[in-house]
From Swiss-Prot:
Protein residues bound to NAD(+): R175, I176, D196, P231, L232, H233, E234, S235, T257, D283, H312, M313, S314, G315
pH relationship of activity: Optimum pH is 5.
Molecular function GO labels: formate dehydrogenase (NAD+) activity; NAD binding; oxidoreductase activity, acting on the CH-OH group of donors, NAD or NADP as acceptor
Enzyme class: oxidoreductase
UniProt KW NAD keyword: yes
Binding-site residues for substrate, renumbered to this chain: I94, N120
Record gene name: FDH
Purpose of the protein: Catalyzes the NAD(+)-dependent oxidation of formate to carbon dioxide. Formate oxidation is the final step in the methanol oxidation pathway in methylotrophic microorganisms. Has a role in the detoxification of exogenous formate in non-methylotrophic organisms.
Xref: HAMAP family: Formate_dehydrogenase (MF_03210)
Protein name per the record: Formate dehydrogenase
Family: Belongs to the D-isomer specific 2-hydroxyacid dehydrogenase family. FDH subfamily.
Origin: domain of life: Eukaryota
Temperature dependence as stated in the record: Thermostable up to 55 degrees Celsius.
Site residues, Important for catalytic activity: R259, H312
Length: 370
């Protein structure tokens, strides 16, 4: 019998109304009956942050843990050291930066860390394009004006622009970044740029109509819109700080659906306040859930707009939840059956080694100036 611990977010009445909210503590990724029919135990909780949390208590004798980027149970080196039986850590979604991967490689002979690669890349890419449009078209202040019973076209049109003719750049052109560029192609942007250590093929660049810029600061200086689509690792943590933001065009927009810790939140808020950034939007925060006084909840530009922040939802649409729930079950089945036939693309660390280059495990994956 195997004990499985799942750290998920609470759905409350919403999970009852919509059973498709699979990523909640109530609906448990649809796993309970399947696991219990095999004689295994499933413990589900959202309690993860306080001292002596259910997460901490139940982790000590769990063999498998399931976490999610949308309500991350941070698997620190200290927590892993107490998890004497842990063999498999599964991310329900994509992005395993909430796990100390170096420590996972050294714990219990090497804990396998896996995620459901590709499960929500379309979902996030769509959210990026939506956020770009929401910011550029100044949608949020306009909608708030209508809700307040007011009507002042000039007030909102003074900070509204077209996406056509703008230069858009992505930091990272992996599965999400590439899909963002493809979706932007139809907006007749002046130019689509990308910064990544790994270039796209010439054929893809021609098909999408994009161009690689090898220096990050050089790309930022050209862009009206910048979207962050790279993983969080030590070279990208705090990357968008006061210094790097100062290299961006004054009045540009920044979108972040990657990870909250890639930006320095106070520096983003100050750039908004001064108008150096016209807008900032996305759905990722650090920590998560975001505290009520998190500066990016209320940061605004000089016109009182420019904020398109939402809870961490871009990758957890109902369609995405179905895909990553199925993926988690597939990974669990590979382990519980003893086949260990994981999809190679799902593996982050395995058998004490890194199985991917996505988390900065290369000498050439270094951000200039870092």
């Amino acid at each position: 019998m195997v004990k499985v611990l799942a750290v998920l977010y609470d759905g409350g009445e919403h999970a009852k109304q919509v059973p498709g909210l699979l990523g909640t503590t109530e609906n448990e990724l649809g796993l309970r009956k399947w696991l219990e029919d095999q004689g295994h135990t499933l413990v589900t909780t959202s309690d993860k942050d306080r001292e002596g949390s259910t997460f901490d208590r139940e982790l000590e004798d769990a063999e498998i843990i399931i976490t999610t980027p949308f309500h991350p149970g941070y698997l620190t080196a200290e927590r892993l050291a107490r998890a004497k039986k842990l063999k498999l850590a599964v991310t329900a979604g994509i992005g395993s930066d909430h796990v100390d991967l170096d420590a996972a490689n050294k714990t219990n002979g090497g804990i396998t860390v896996a995620e459901v690669t590709g499960s929500n890349v379309v979902s996030v890419a769509e959210h990026v394009v939506m956020t770009i449009l929401v910011l550029v078209r100044n949608f949020v202040p306009a909608h708030e004006q209508i809700e307040a019973g007011r009507w002042d076209v000039a007030e909102v049109a003074k900070d509204e622009y077209d996406l056509e003719g703008k230069v858009v750049g992505t930091v990272g052109v992996g599965r999400i970044g590439e899909r963002v560029l493809r979706r932007l192609k139809g907006f007749d942007c002046k130019e689509l740029l990308y910064y990544d250590y790994q270039p796209l093929s010439p054929e893809k660049e021609k098909e999408i109509g994009c161009r690689r810029v090898e220096n990050l600061e050089e790309m930022l200086a050209q862009c009206d819109v910048v979207t962050i689509n790279c993983p969080l690792h030590e070279s990208t943590r705090g990357l968008f700080n006061k210094d790097l933001i100062s290299k961006m065009k004054r009045g540009s927009w920044l979108v972040n659906t990657a990870r909250g810790a890639i930006v320095v939140k106070e520096d983003v808020a100050e750039a908004l306040r001064t108008g150096h950034l016209r807008g900032y939007g996305g759905d990722v925060w650090f920590p998560q859930p975001a505290p009520a006084d998190h500066v990016l909840r209320t940061a605004k530009n000089p016109f009182g707009g420019g904020n398109a922040m939402v809870p961490h939802m871009s990758g957890t649409s109902l369609d995405a939840q179905k895909r990553y729930a199925e993926g988690v079950k597939r990974i669990l089945d590979s382990y519980l059956s003893g086949r260990f036939d994981y999809r190679p693309e799902d593996l982050i660390v395995h058998q004490g080694k890194y199985a991917t280059r996505a988390y900065g495990q290369r000498e050439d994956v270094k951000i200039p100036g870092q």
